[in-house]
Amino acid sequence: MAEITVPYEYDGRQFEGMLVWDDSVAGQRPAIFMQPDWFGVCRHSAGMASEVAGRDYVVLMADMYGVGYGEREKTEAELLASAQGVRRDLPFILGCGAVAHAALTEEAEKHGLIDPERRGAIGFCMGGGIALEQVRAGADFKGTVVFHVTLPNPVDAAATPDFKGRVLAIHGAADPVTPKPMMDALEAELTGAGVDWQIMNFGHATHSFCVEGANNPPVQVYDEALCRQSYRLMRDFFTHTF
């Protein structure tokens, strides 16, 4: 797999996203814009991006936390504070997210990697909530997939959603971080907005079932089999979307 670090600036701050793709495969592929979990851009999230990309996609991974954040050691309290700070700041999510997507797309097009007509988005955990904010604000992705999403509901509940594409949420029925009422509210929002949506609810699954090393039952537990099944569902969803 190949990786390229892509720098960009937003509001006077420096960020570094990443392109991830299989360089043994020729030709243009769909571009999948990825909002990683609260660890940010690091070896952990690069590994997830590589799994997602496979031979099928080029992953454009956004950095929403700033240069060096991902590789720095952090306590859980620091992770939570940073992630919540980003998640609550809707203007930052939309502004920095748009700049990240533009910079990553420009770099991918420079290398002839992507088909600009086939654009999707994904997000893991807190990144899933961030991705949903982008698409409900009108970001033009043909399909969006969120895995064990955190805070799926809008910061600005009074705003009229402007979804452009399909949505798939892959979730754990026993996820205490994002319990059923939150997912029910997301379902109602998507239905009300006329979105072509799907929600796959895995029985007994907790939060972070795609995060290797997660082991804090009953809150979050990695499940390799469910994660692989999730990626198959994602691929099937995008195959029918593009």
Model-derived regions: residue spans:
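N-terminal cap/leader regions of alpha/beta-hydrolase-fold enzymes
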Residues: 1-242
